């Protein structure tokens, strides 16, 4: 819908219809919406999406996408030798486009699988470089989109890339979101089993954001459960959240599934998670996502510590001190 009185400019009928069409396009992508009223923000957003769309393929060819690594800190040792691979877009003009601005457009235009594979290849290349240099490396997790996961050749494609770079088993972890897990449980179980047989580790991301099912943990052979950051935000239900978190961790520990807490930002959260035997932590309290060279410097430092005398990270110790001071 486009109201004539809302337009500051004098338009011909074609221009008016053009703006109504902009509004119509937003209805197609919205949930439970039957109409939309045009305003300038709609046109700006659609023009922005079009500009992203027009340069997506070329940007992939030009390798404008950078892989960043967000370390995961082991709460027992305090070492950060594992990480999650994330993507950033640095245009040829030097502009950094955050993932929330381009990933939804890649998904909408069915190009997200190409981006997934691009990141996966970059991670494999990083691991191979370290192995060839005789440097230690630990598990790196990569995110897989719904579209990628349901590709008929998904497992074979990723296995072929893994084999091309000669990556040993268990150094690559495939992250799938909880929402994917509930689309088709039978297909999920089959695909996860295939991935495991090819030497991949499997993690469920964003656990707790959807209709989590305990049968999923019982029937699907996952290795890692990532507890969503929504459990750790300040809320009036903090005590109940902590009870739920402890229950989840107790359960999955008994199932030999490792736990990662996401979005951790305070010493109080670290102390609590250490007290309930969470395995790893990821969040700004320790590290933001880092470019490859900075992550590699951390790896080299952490492994040097590990080879001499393993010691807890200073921030883990700070969290333990927080516990002593507040109890």
Predicted regions and their residues:
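Catalytic core of bacterial c-di-GMP phosphodiesterases, primarily the EAL and HD-GYP domains
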Residues: 3-7, 45, 75-84, 110-188, ...
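Active-site core of bacterial EAL-family cyclic-dinucleotide phosphodiesterase domains
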Residues: 37-106, 143, 204, 261, ...
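EAL-family c-di-GMP phosphodiesterase catalytic domain
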Residues: 75-76, 92-93, 145-152, 171-186, ...
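The cytosolic transmitter module of two-component sensor histidine kinases
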Residues: 9, 13, 49-52, 116, ...
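Cyclic nucleotide signaling catalytic output domains
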Residues: 1-8, 12-30, 36-51, 55, ...
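Nucleotide second-messenger and two-component phosphorelay signaling modules
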Residues: 30, 62, 74, 92, ...
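Inter-domain helical "communication" segments and dimerization helices
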Residues: 4-66, 111-114, 124-125, 133, ...
